Amino acid sequence: MSIDINNRLYTALVTPMFEDGSIDWISFEKLLKTQEYYECGVLILGSTGEALSLDFDEQCEVVRFVTNLNLSVPIMVGVGGFQLAKQLQWIEFCQTQRVDCFLVVTPLYTKPGAASQTGWFKAVLDKAERPCMLYNVPSRTGINLAEEVLTSLKKHPNLWALKEASGDIQRCARYHDLAPNLVIYSGEDGLLPELADVGARGLVSVISNVWPEQTKKYVRQSLAHEITVEDKAVWEAATRSCFSVANPIPVKVWLAHNSLITTNTLRAPLLADELQDLSLLISADSLVKDWFSHI
């Protein structure tokens, strides 16, 4: 079955765990099936999925599990680190499974410049046999995706999309101007309406873990430029509630609070205890559901 990867909404999915830190496969399948029901693409093993806290064997097990479900929505897998050989090994494994596309983040921690970034991304794109979405998230990597990367690689056959999460609308506009054929996704839930105005065509979302149906409608209206000031306030509140402490703590806490996963357990260094007050999530949940009921 051919899968269309140009889904307007991908959910950066959490990885549910039991209290001992082992993966809760039953809860994981339920989350995946929920996303499938609402026709959301799924991103597994991104930062929201705590990929860097899982060892290689666990990551492989996650990919096997998800791809064996034969979901009817596209499956994107995160690629990220600072050891190129390991990333290429990871891609090689994923390509033995039914993975549809990759999310490739700027190298972590090392802050490479334009030439170094270009070399890194070219090596990854050359290895990949699937479409790749580059990922600009300087709040996590310490460096922006260099514009020269897009100038040099925009015609690479495996470069498909860009996830933009710098918070800089003008930077997104420049990326779009440099590579107009690149599909741009907002990587920030609350900024989708603004990024849609400068060329974004979709969202890679954290909050759709919590509100998949409602977020799908929000994406549709944002891309149609139909979001009002009042609508914007609702979704900004929803975004704040899911990022009040380090992601994915709030999402896991809320999913567990609503019995959608068994526990709110995270892998070290993250602890659910960072979020003691659920008032922002409770308020946002009410706002989002009220908004949706009046659409």
Swiss-Prot record:
<keyword id="KW-0457">Lysine biosynthesis</keyword>
<feature type="binding site">
    <location>
        <position position="48"/>
    </location>
    <ligand>
        <name>pyruvate</name>
    </ligand>
</feature>
<dbReference type="InterPro" id="IPR013785">
    <property type="entry name" value="Aldolase_TIM"/>
</dbReference>
<comment type="similarity">
    <text>Belongs to the DapA family.</text>
</comment>
<dbReference type="GO" id="GO:0005829">
    <property type="term" value="C:cytosol"/>
</dbReference>
<keyword id="KW-0704">Schiff base</keyword>
<dbReference type="InterPro" id="IPR002220">
    <property type="entry name" value="DapA-like"/>
</dbReference>
<dbReference type="GO" id="GO:0008840">
    <property type="term" value="F:4-hydroxy-tetrahydrodipicolinate synthase activity"/>
</dbReference>
<keyword id="KW-0456">Lyase</keyword>
<dbReference type="InterPro" id="IPR020625">
    <property type="entry name" value="Schiff_base-form_aldolases_AS"/>
</dbReference>
<feature type="binding site">
    <location>
        <position position="204"/>
    </location>
    <ligand>
        <name>pyruvate</name>
    </ligand>
</feature>
<dbReference type="GO" id="GO:0019877">
    <property type="term" value="P:diaminopimelate biosynthetic process"/>
</dbReference>
<comment type="function">
    <text>Catalyzes the condensation of (S)-aspartate-beta-semialdehyde [(S)-ASA] and pyruvate to 4-hydroxy-tetrahydrodipicolinate (HTPA).</text>
</comment>
<feature type="site" description="Part of a proton relay during catalysis">
    <location>
        <position position="47"/>
    </location>
</feature>
<keyword id="KW-0963">Cytoplasm</keyword>
<dbReference type="InterPro" id="IPR020624">
    <property type="entry name" value="Schiff_base-form_aldolases_CS"/>
</dbReference>
<protein>
    <recommendedName>
        <fullName>4-hydroxy-tetrahydrodipicolinate synthase</fullName>
        <ecNumber>4.3.3.7</ecNumber>
    </recommendedName>
</protein>
<dbReference type="InterPro" id="IPR005263">
    <property type="entry name" value="DapA"/>
</dbReference>
<keyword id="KW-0220">Diaminopimelate biosynthesis</keyword>
<comment type="subunit">
    <text>Homotetramer; dimer of dimers.</text>
</comment>
<dbReference type="GO" id="GO:0009089">
    <property type="term" value="P:lysine biosynthetic process via diaminopimelate"/>
</dbReference>
<feature type="active site" description="Proton donor/acceptor">
    <location>
        <position position="135"/>
    </location>
</feature>
<feature type="site" description="Part of a proton relay during catalysis">
    <location>
        <position position="109"/>
    </location>
</feature>
<comment type="pathway">
    <text>Amino-acid biosynthesis; L-lysine biosynthesis via DAP pathway; (S)-tetrahydrodipicolinate from L-aspartate: step 3/4.</text>
</comment>
<dbReference type="Pfam" id="PF00701">
    <property type="entry name" value="DHDPS"/>
</dbReference>
<feature type="active site" description="Schiff-base intermediate with substrate">
    <location>
        <position position="163"/>
    </location>
</feature>
<keyword id="KW-0028">Amino-acid biosynthesis</keyword>
